[in-house]
Amino acid sequence: PGSTIKPIVALSALENKIINTKFKVHCKGHKNPLELYGQTYHCWKKEGHGLLNLREAMKQSCDTYFYEVARRLGVDKLSETAKKFGLGEKVFNNLFDNEKSGLVPSTFWKKNALGKNWLLGETIITGIGQGYIQTTPIQLCLMTAQIANGGYKIYPKIIIDDSINEDDKFQSLVNQTNNIKIIQDAMFSSTNELRGT
């Protein structure tokens, strides 16, 4: 999914009290990349973004910021939040035979599926939507809609008739409503402000 995963990474870090809105990371682009076990991780912006808080990092889609957030958060907490928002599972619950569930990786998943331990570098790249993580377009729509609606679970359906489904209840997906507002504002800034990506 690439950078479309960044709102969930940020929300998960806020919900787990790993960061707050004042948490800053200095992005130096290609000048001083993060080096870990022989791998180099740098931002997409060659000259870097400078010192960024959450809102600015989301607006400018700074990879360096999200590497650090993912590193602090850990893949298991990120996985838990992503699954709450519908990633890693079929959206229409067997309505379509060819719908894919995608993949939200975790330490348990890798050990169980591949027989290997999870690596810190894998957490870092998961923070920018790279590596094992896989999503479908409808999952990303659902994730975004649930952020936009204030963090409430949506049960999408194909409308056959207009009867009301009693299963449609307002189930909050977040611990603190302020966290979802922070993410909404950052997403808005990405598309509506100068330097937004």
Give the ranges of each region predicted by the language model.
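Beta-lactam-recognizing serine transpeptidase/beta-lactamase-like catalytic domain environment
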Residues: 1-3, 8-197
